[in-house]
Amino acid sequence: MKLLAATVLLLTICSLEGALVRRQAKEPCVDNLVSQYFQTVTDYGKDLMEKVKSPELQAEAKSYFEKSKEQLTPLIKKAGTELVNFLSYFMELGTQPATQ
């Protein structure tokens, strides 16, 4: 029984000592965190710019935009036509009661 009580007492003291050490530890400075964040963003931006400069990536992006333009142009024309028809329908509704 004494061994059990001594073990519980020892575990309690160790956990309290650990909590005290954690409380006394220095918290990371916010300025350092912000500067590290901006440094990381800057490094990422530099790496991205180096990757964008490659001719393969530029050619791939150009072909992607051309293909997208080919696919979207008919859809945009169709949507524009339907919008004009839709608005003209409401314009006709507005003029009908006045003529009756």
UniProtKB/Swiss-Prot annotation:
Pfam families with a match to the protein in the record: ApoA-II
Modified residues (Methionine sulfoxide): M49
Keywords from the named record: Cleavage on pair of basic residues, Disulfide bond, HDL, Lipid transport, Oxidation, Phosphoprotein, Secreted, Signal, Transport
GO molecular function terms attached to this record: high-density lipoprotein particle binding; lipid binding; protein heterodimerization activity
GO cellular component entries: spherical high-density lipoprotein particle
Main subcellular location: secreted
Presence of keyword Signal: yes
Coiled-coil portions: none
Position of the signal peptide: 1-18
PTM sites of type Phosphoserine: S54, S68
Biological process annotations from GO: cholesterol homeostasis; cholesterol transport; lipoprotein metabolic process; peptidyl-methionine modification; positive regulation of interleukin-8 production; positive regulation of phagocytosis; protein oxidation; protein stabilization
Localization: Secreted
Presence of the UniProt keyword Transport in the record: yes
Tissues of expression: Plasma.
Function noted in UniProt: May stabilize HDL (high density lipoprotein) structure by its association with lipids, and affect the HDL metabolism.
Matching PANTHER family: APOLIPOPROTEIN A-II
Family to which this protein belongs: Belongs to the apolipoprotein A2 family.
Quaternary structure and partners: Homodimer; disulfide-linked. Interacts with NAXE and NDRG1.
Protein name: Apolipoprotein A-II
